[in-house]
Amino acid sequence: VLSPADKNNVKSAWKAIGSHAGEHGAEALERMFLSFPPTKTYFPHFDLSHGSAQIKTHGKKVADALTNAVNHIDDMPGALSALSDLHAHKLRVDPVNFKLLSHCLLVTLASHHPAEFTPAVHASLDKFFAAVSTVLTSKYR
């Protein structure tokens, strides 16, 4: 459960990330593919080379979904319902992959925003990504 302080930390961090969210999303995907090669199996039709247009496009989709979650932090299940349906019923993504991407997002954000990435912000973002992952996997049951 995100506390009021967590919600404020997440909103502040996301504001600092700002227009770079799509780039960071793409970098986190690349990081995930390199660190956890089995995750590539969900993207057989993608050019997975560094800087590919497909990774950039999907990274922006990830960032846009997270921005939507931040903007609806008090109703993430409602805001992410269609995305949850897509990942559970059509794409059938293994739920563990959300945790892997969350970790890669944390590493990417910490590397680009060290001043903003305090221990409290790190903890809040970790909880936020876990909450997003829970929502995205809620329709698997």
UniProtKB/Swiss-Prot annotation:
Keywords: Heme, Iron, Metal-binding, Oxygen transport, Transport. One of its GO terms (molecular function) is heme binding. Red blood cells. Heme b binds at residue 87. The keyword Heme applies. O2 binds at residue 58. One of its GO terms (biological process) is hydrogen peroxide catabolic process. It comes from the Eukaryota. One of its GO terms (cellular component) is blood microparticle. SUPFAM superfamilies: Globin-like (SSF46458). InterPro entries: Globin (IPR000971), Globin-like_sf (IPR009050), Globin/Proto (IPR012292), Hemoglobin_a-typ (IPR002338), Hemoglobin_oxygen_transport (IPR050056), Hemoglobin_pi (IPR002339). Residues 1-141 form the Globin domain. Pfam families: Globin (PF00042). PROSITE patterns: GLOBIN. Heterotetramer of two alpha chains and two beta chains. Involved in oxygen transport from the lung to the various peripheral tissues. Belongs to the globin family. This is Hemoglobin subunit alpha-2.
